[in-house]
């Protein structure tokens, strides 16, 4: 079994607690949260507001995915829509980070690609949830 530096099993090797951990979008959202945390940790002191906003948005994506898994139909779609909105907000924030040159291009590119992927997956989940609510 693989472990994180703190000694806990990695997410990939923890026993599955529910359907949430089987969702690729959830795992990708957690990875995005991790990448954003690494990026904002490098910001200068004057960027505290942007750092806080990006941490909040990146944390909100997996939270709302988790909330959606526990719901059905339109309520599920609504939770996924909130997650999508937060992912889109994060995409804009990452664009601002790129313009302001606040993070290494490689790290930023990886986070941007992952944010785009999460947004695309959420869009599909929203369509699916809406189709099942009819």
Task: For each feature predicted by the language model, list its residue ranges.
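Amphipathic alpha-helical assembly/interaction segments
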Residues: 1-134
């Amino acid at each position: 079994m693989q472990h994180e530096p703190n000694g806990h099993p990695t997410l990939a090797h923890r026993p599955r607690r529910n359907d949430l951990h089987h969702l690729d979008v959830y795992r990708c959202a957690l990875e995005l949260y991790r990448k954003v945390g690494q990026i904002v940790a490098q910001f200068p002191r004057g960027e505290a507001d942007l750092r806080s906003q990006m941490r909040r948005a990146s944390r909100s994506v997996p939270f709302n995915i988790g909330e959606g898994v526990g719901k059905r139909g339109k309520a599920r779609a609504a939770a996924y829509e909130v997650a999508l909105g937060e992912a889109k907000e994060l995409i804009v924030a990452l664009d601002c980070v790129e313009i302001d040159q606040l993070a290494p291009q490689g790290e930023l590119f990886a986070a941007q690609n992952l944010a785009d992927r999460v947004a695309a997956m959420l869009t599909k989940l929203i369509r699916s949830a809406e189709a099942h609510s009819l």
